[in-house]
Amino acid sequence: MRNDAIKWFVCVVFSGVLLVACGGTKLTTTQVDDARREKPVSDILVIAITYEKELRHSFEDKFVEQLKTAGIEAVSSADVIPISEKQQLEKDAILKAVNEFENDAVIITHMVGVEEKEIITRAPSRGYYGHYLWAYGNTHEPGYSSTRITVRLATNLYDVKTEKLIWSGKSETLRPDSINQIIDDVIKAVIKDLQKNKLLPPK
């Protein structure tokens, strides 16, 4: 898939090919610092790594909203550290922001990769003319092939003072049908696991 088609997540249009329905999001791996388990953070700076300015805002704003709903203070880096597209955040700018807003943790999300796999429906064994009829029908109707898209993201939570990793997780979204679905599902999965490990304060 071309880079301009992927951007941060994935935007795919298939002509005459069935895109399989949404498959949902799950955390495939997680890691927690045992010393920090059940020691919740209180205020998070949210950073999404992407060249696309609108996607950065969208992801971070949704993450901040969900964290606040979960009972924790949070701020979007896009709101407090504005940068141009394709420009990286400088460490000094991040430190200035966490000091100004008194964040005790930083959470960073980036894309690991996008996998696209075409699934071909195999012809049943019906003899040569049965095969012809089956193939003819599927050639003239959608559904002969399908494309499975898998989007993988990684999210890390760091302690501001020590800069040590508190929690990390890798997510996998199978057959996403929109960018918003990926964003919403990943955020929900991450927050749920942080709550399970009592890294977020009780509401």
Identify the meaning behind each predicted range.
Residues D43, I47-E116:
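N-terminal segment of the mature soluble domain
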Residues C22-S42, Y51, H140-K203:
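C-terminal/domain-edge helix-coil "capping" segments
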Residues Q31-V46, P124-G137:
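Charged, low-complexity, helix/coiled-coil-prone segments
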